[in-house]
């Protein structure tokens, strides 16, 4: 997850010190002012994406869970879900994301949210927004959801409805967004980058401004579930889309709009941003590289900083990796499954850099990127450690002296050409 509005636009957001170790205004803070975070995979705790129902009232063309408006067997009961929340709270996970299917379809949605609140868990919900009326928005606000992420595929109602498989979905989703805004609930958009979305980016950013939306996350497509039937962006299309998002994000900040813009699920976005800032002579280029390296870079992602529990209680490295299961919460707590490295893939995810192959193995950014999204690589090639085909960096851009991710308390040297090396001595 790349916070474009912070790194490129210079926005100060509440999450900035936690994600990047410092406020954007701190050029080189002393060690005692930097955020203290675990520096090893074993000590990390994951954000847990919990697909606690597969049932959905829509049928989206890019749905990674292949959900439909039917009841599915084997989903966790209310008591089982509460036991999972108890374990996650004791384990110290930084956040739990209620997802689906459509999570608000579960009859016990609010009961589980209230239980999570009692445990002081940081809870987010990912929803299509069609079930959020004014009363639901007020209840969500009352239960102190940190954030409501609502899926949108286009600013054009016809295109959105076609993607969602239901006429009128756009208007119902927009009503849900407006109800959240009206009650003061933090709300944002979740958009998957497809050819339709990319051609619609100017209109989407106009909608963000017009509707006073707090946040927008642009997800690179992972071809899981029904998403495998969609054409992925070419590398040139990806670069154009990311450039457009960078530019629009900076413009929002310059005009005084405090909107968080993030890109998700392609970790080469970070190196690409730094290369662009370096090329443009941006005064914060060095600072941004340090911030990207903070917290171990993106190599601490799936299987370390991100985890997944599906509708039946199976545990996966992330929500796109349901083809591989490490255990089930009905048999063992998530905390035990997550720390068990007897499975070679789980062990590898926690120390992945030596296992990467192909262009990832020789890439100078691998300590920042971590080989990007392993699920996309494995779906495309059948090999866990193969290069991610979503990487749009050129061979020339990834060649050169490796960039070294140092501890947050260390200041590494910078080569004249912008490459970094570990401090000597």
Where are these regions (language model features)?
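Flexible mid-to-C-terminal extensions adjoining Fe-S/redox cofactors in radical SAM and related proteins
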Residues: 2-4, 10, 320-425
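Conserved alpha-helical substructure of the radical SAM core
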Residues: 2-147
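Short, basic/aromatic recognition patches
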Residues: 288-298
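Radical SAM/AdoMet-radical enzyme domain recognition
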Residues: 78-99, 105-240
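Short, acidic, Ser/Thr-enriched surface-loop or helix-capping motifs
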Residues: 309-310
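C-terminal accessory region of radical SAM enzymes
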Residues: 237-287, 314-364, 369-370
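Short beta-strand segments
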Residues: 51, 190-191, 217-220, 262-265, ...
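Short, small/polar residue-rich loop motifs at catalytic or cofactor-binding pockets
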Residues: 300-304
């Amino acid at each position: 997850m790349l916070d474009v509005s912070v790194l490129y636009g210079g926005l100060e957001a509440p999450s900035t010190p936690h994600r990047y170790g410092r406020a954007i205004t701190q050029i080189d803070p002393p060690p005692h002012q930097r955020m203290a975070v675990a520096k090893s995979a074993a000590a990390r705790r994951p954000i847990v994406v919990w697909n606690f129902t597969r049932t959905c009232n829509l049928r989206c063309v890019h749905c990674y869970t292949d959900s439909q408006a039917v009841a599915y067997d084997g989903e966790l009961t209310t008591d089982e879900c509460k036991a999972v929340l108890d374990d996650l709270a004791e384990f110290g996970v930084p956040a739990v994301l209620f997802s689906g299917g459509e999570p608000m379809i579960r009859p016990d949605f609010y009961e589980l949210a209230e239980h999570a609140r009692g445990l002081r868990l940081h809870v987010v919900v990912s929803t299509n927004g069609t079930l959020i009326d004014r009363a639901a928005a007020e209840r969500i606000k009352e239960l102190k959801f940190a954030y409501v992420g609502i899926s949108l595929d286009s600013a054009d109602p016809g295109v959105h409805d076609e993607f969602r498989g239901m006429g009128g979905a756009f208007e119902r989703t927009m009503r849900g967004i407006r109800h959240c805004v009206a009650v003061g609930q933090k709300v944002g958009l979740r958009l998957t980058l497809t050819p339709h979305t990319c051609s619609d980016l100017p209109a989407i950013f106009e909608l963000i401004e017009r509707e006073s939306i707090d946040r927008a996350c642009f997800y690179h497509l992972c071809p899981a579930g029904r998403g495998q039937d969609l054409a992925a962006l070419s590398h040139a299309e990806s670069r154009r889309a990311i450039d457009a998002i960078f530019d629009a994000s900076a413009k929002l900040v310059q005009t005084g709009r405090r909107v968080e813009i993030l890109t998700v699920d392609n970790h080469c976005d970070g190196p690409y941003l730094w290369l662009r800032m370096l090329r443009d002579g941006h005064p914060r280029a060095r600072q941004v590289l340090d911030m990207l390296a903070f917290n171990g870079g993106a190599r601490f992602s799936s299987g370390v900083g991100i985890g997944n529990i599906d509708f039946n209680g199976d545990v996966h490295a992330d929500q796109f990796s349901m083809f591989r299961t490490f255990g089930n919460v009905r048999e063992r707590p998530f905390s035990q499954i997550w720390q068990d490295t007897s499975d070679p893939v789980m062990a590898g995810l926690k120390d992945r850099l030596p296992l990467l192959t192909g262009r990832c193995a020789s890439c100078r950014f691998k300590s920042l990127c971590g080989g990007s999204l392993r699920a996309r690589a494995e779906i495309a090639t059948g090999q866990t450690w193969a290069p991610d085909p979503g990487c749009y960096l050129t061979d020339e851009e990834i060649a050169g002296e490796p960039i070294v991710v140092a501890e947050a308390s260390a200041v590494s040297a910078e080569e004249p050409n912008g490459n970094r090396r570990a401090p000597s001595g």
